[in-house]
Structures are given as C-alpha cells and as structure tokens.
C-alpha cells in the first residue's frame, strides 16, 4: 500500500477534473456505496470500463493517462469508474467492501486498486486495517484488491471526486 503525490502533470489533472465536472459528463445515482443492497448512503458514479469493455466516451482522455502513468496497459484493466460524493453536512461512513463488480468476490487473479483523487477535502478512504487516506488532489493511492476499505464523505467542500481503477497485476499469469 502506498501513495504517489503529484501523480499526473497538473495540466492533465486539471483537464480530467474539468471534463468530469462539465456539462457533458453524465453522473448516475447509486443508492448504496459499500454493498449492493446496503443502507450506507449514496453516491454518483460514472463507469468508464467494465466487463463489457469501454462504457464511456471519456475513457481515452481520463483512464488512459492514469493507467499508462501507473505502468500497465489496457490488457490489465478490469474496471474503471469515477466516484462523486456530495457534502451531506456530516461525515457518512460507508460499508467496508472489496472492489469487484461481481457481488463483492475477489477477482480470479491477483489484482490491485488505484484510487486517484481529483479534489482535496476532509473526506477519506479508510482501510479495515485502520489506515486513513485523506482526499488530496492529484494523489494516487495503490493497494491490493483484497483489502477491505470504505469511503467517508467530506464536510468541507461540495464535492469529493476520485477515480477508481481495478487492474490485474502486470505479471499475473493471464497477462504475460
């Protein structure tokens, strides 16, 4: 588990944020955050890539710079999505979960998570092991997909936006 500050160049970070907050980007309401049928709050999401392949016109300009900077290619990609949390006047702790679109099960092969923050605020991602990673603009958090984690909403800004990318480790048997 580690973080990289100033993960992308400032122009790319600004461009990604402007695209995600512009009028052309559709955000979709998600009635629960940590589990499919939980009552742990809500968020908005935008899927770039999942088991169906590319799902968004923003894929090339948002996902590719992140995965290439992280050192892997599209063949390693499992899922990529953006998360948008609104300020609800108090910190909402969502349910712990592992990232996987298939009912919370681990991916079949070793996989990692990149959580790329586009905004700075007092919202954070908390690992079940106790570590907290506050939302710092242009910072990427890297961790193993098997680690349970949760998001906690911010109270000091209107929006918290991050990009969540799940990927097979490049040296995984299926990607060699």
Name every feature range the model reports, one short phrase each.
Residues 133-149:
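Conserved metal-binding segment of the jelly-roll/cupin
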Residues 1-76:
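Non-heme Fe(II)/2-oxoglutarate
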Residues 72-92:
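A short glycine-rich, His/Asp/Glu-containing loop-to-beta-strand
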Residues 95-96, 125, 148-156:
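Short beta-strand His + acidic residue motifs that chelate non-heme Fe in jelly-roll/DSBH
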Residues 2, 7, 142, 164-166, ...:
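Charged, amphipathic alpha-helical segments and their flanking helix caps
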Residues 90-96, 101-103, 109-111, 117-136:
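A short beta-strand-loop-beta hairpin characteristic of the jelly-roll/cupin
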Residues 113-116, 157-173:
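A short hydrophobic beta-strand segment most commonly corresponding to one strand
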